[in-house]
Every structure is written in structure tokens, then in C-alpha cells.
Amino acid sequence: MGESFYTRTTEAPSSAFDLSLRPPAFSEFCGQEKIKDRLMLMVEAARQRDDVLDHILLSGPPGLGKTTLANIIANAVGCRIHTTSGPQIEKAGDLAGVLTNLEKGDILFIDEIHRLHPAIEEYLYPAMEDFRLDIIIDQGPNARSIQLNLPKFTLVGATTRAGMLTSPLRSRFGLVNRLDYYTREELCAIIERSAGLLNVPVDPEGALQIALRSRGTPRVANSLLRWVRDYAQVRGDGVITEQLAHDALTMIEIDDDGLDEMDKRLLEAMIYKFNGGPVGLSSLAVAVGEDASTLEDVHEPFLIMQGYISRTPRGRVAMPSAYLKMGAAPPANGQGWLL
């Protein structure tokens, strides 16, 4: 296999397929119940006051529904949503162009907000607090500041790395929520809903097979469903059963535990090349031929969650379950596990 399925799925922007399955309302959004309750309360309170929502920060791993929730909030409020991302706002003029296009009550959604340049953040602070934009015209002794009043708006920021947000920016959000991985039952419900929208019959056991390999992530679940649907159409009778789902996912080298080829290469490198660790992330990235940030964002969270590896102050360490998974004998002294 070439590029990891999970890398393609979690790092790629939302496709037309993803958008077609996106729930439009809180009532159709499965999972994240506590966050949904908070957001629905905020929306109702703002509606009763006839005011705009406070600024909201959504953090968590990719594919858990941050963008979907931002759109649901806009639908619930009945306002427009303007979408951009941190890397797209390269200079103050880019931010000014976005902010001056807003109308009262609009939502500005900034994905990857942790990637905003610190200089851009300085312009964002008065916009968030006082709905004011201060622009510096000219340079040197001729420099002067022009103040533009902005309509009251809501900033919804999304980040996969909340720790990279500066403290001043983080403190300006009225509500900060971290999305968690989804349970097996929640993923089954999402898969069955998506299958219904796609007019694909799926057995409960077939949905479970897909859910078990979805890494707690709806975007992965829907991408796997898309592949299994195609497999069922060509190799089966169109119905997604337990056996058919198993065969379809085995074909793309995703095993019963949800590990793909890159996951196994990562574990093999830790065990056989680095004697179980501890090993640094950059060394691992070179050993498996993958970008370090991809390993950290896409593969490590699942492997840590499943108990295959652990992070220690000295580096990554392969845990006993990793040796068992790869059919290797654990070191007798259990090196690294207690570091």
C-alpha cells in the first residue's frame, strides 16, 4: 500500500462526500453530548437576549466534528458563516478583508487557528473584545492608525493543538470545548445514519465491523463506509454484512484492531530498530519514511489510546501489547516502560 489510509482521511480537507453526510442540526449530531448541551444553551440564551453568541473555541484531534459543529451553530442561530483558516490569513490585510465583510450576528470560523501569526493575533484581539479593527497606514514618521468599527460577530476557532494557542488569544474565548473520541456505539449510530443517506443496507454487525476500525473518529468511519459500500456493490449483493465489511477492510490492509500498514511499520521500527525505545519522534519519522507531524497527529494518538506505545520524558516506548501484536518477545527487563 502507498500512503496510509488514516493519513489520507484525517489530513485531507472535507470532500463533497463528507459534506453530503454532515448533520445540519444538533438533533442529528451524534456524540459529544456535553458539548452539544453547552452550545444549545448558549444559542438559546443569545436568542432570548437578542444578542450575538460569545466567541467559541473547539479543540481536539482531526475528524471529530469541529467544522460540523461550527456550521450547526450557524444554522441554529440563523446566520451566515464565513470560513477561513490560520494559514490563509498571512497579513493584516487578509484579516481586514474577512472582518469587514461580516454582518451583525455572523459567524467567522477560523480552522487551524493555532497557526495564526502572532502579529495577526494582535489585530484580532480588539476585533474580538471591542468589535474594532485598528489598521496602521504607512510606515515610519508618516504612520497613522485608522480605526474601523465592526458589526458584532462570533468567532469560532478550531484547533488540533490547543497547547500552541497563545494565552492572550485563548483567554478571549468565552467557551472552550475539547472534543473527545467517539464510543463504539456512537460510531455505529453515525455509520447507520450515513448508510441511510447513501441508500446502502447495513447490518448492525456490519456497522460494528466498520466502527471498530474507525479510531473513534466519524470522518474515518464515513470514509471506511464509502469503501465498504463500493466493495459490497462489486463483490457482494450491495448489503454490508459482518463478513463483507471484514473482507473489504482487510483488502485495504486495516486489521481487526484498526491498525493500518503505517501503524505496523511504526511499531516494527520501535521494536526491531530501536529495541523498544525510548526513541525520539524525529528518529521514528526517518525510520518509517513519514512526516513527524503526521505521526504525532494521526498515528500516535490511536496507538497511545490502545496501549501500544507510551510517551516518556526520554521518548516513545513500545508497550507489552505492541510486542504481542507484532509477535515479538518483550524484553526481559521491561526497559523504558516505567521511564
Swiss-Prot record:
DNA binds at residues 311, 316. Disulfide bonds: none annotated. One of its GO terms (biological process) is DNA recombination. It holds the Pfam family AAA_lid_4. Its EC number is 3.6.4.-. Residues 183-253 are annotated as: Small ATPAse domain (RuvB-S). It comes from the Bacteria. Mg(2+) binds at residue 67. It is an enzyme of class 3 (hydrolase). Residues 256-339 are annotated as: Head domain (RuvB-H). It is found in: Cytoplasm. It catalyses: ATP + H2O = ADP + phosphate + H(+). Signal peptide: none annotated. ATP binds at residues 21-22, 63, 66-68, 129-131, 172, 182, 219. Residues 1-182 are annotated as: Large ATPase domain (RuvB-L). InterPro entries: AAA+_ATPase, AAA_lid_4, DNA_helicase_Holl-junc_RuvB, P-loop_NTPase, RuvB-like_N, RuvB_C, WH-like_DNA-bd_sf, WH_DNA-bd_sf. Its main location: cytoplasm. The RuvA-RuvB-RuvC complex processes Holliday junction (HJ) DNA during genetic recombination and DNA repair, while the RuvA-RuvB complex plays an important role in the rescue of blocked DNA replication forks via replication fork reversal (RFR). RuvA specifically binds to HJ cruciform DNA, conferring on it an open structure. The RuvB hexamer acts as an ATP-dependent pump, pulling dsDNA into and through the RuvAB complex. RuvB forms 2 homohexamers on either side of HJ DNA bound by 1 or 2 RuvA tetramers; 4 subunits per hexamer contact DNA at a time. PANTHER family: HOLLIDAY JUNCTION BRANCH MIGRATION COMPLEX SUBUNIT RUVB, PTHR42848. Has 3 domains, the large (RuvB-L) and small ATPase (RuvB-S) domains and the C-terminal head (RuvB-H) domain. The head domain binds DNA, while the ATPase domains jointly bind ATP, ADP or are empty depending on the state of the subunit in the translocation cycle. During a single DNA translocation step the structure of each domain remains the same, but their relative positions change. Homohexamer. Forms an RuvA(8)-RuvB(12)-Holliday junction (HJ) complex. HJ DNA is sandwiched between 2 RuvA tetramers; dsDNA enters through RuvA and exits via RuvB. An RuvB hexamer assembles on each DNA strand where it exits the tetramer. Each RuvB hexamer is contacted by two RuvA subunits (via domain III) on 2 adjacent RuvB subunits; this complex drives branch migration. In the full resolvosome a probable DNA-RuvA(4)-RuvB(12)-RuvC(2) complex forms which resolves the HJ. Belongs to the RuvB family. This is Holliday junction branch migration complex subunit RuvB. It comes from Akkermansia muciniphila (strain ATCC BAA-835 / DSM 22959 / JCM 33894 / BCRC 81048 / CCUG 64013 / CIP 107961 / Muc).
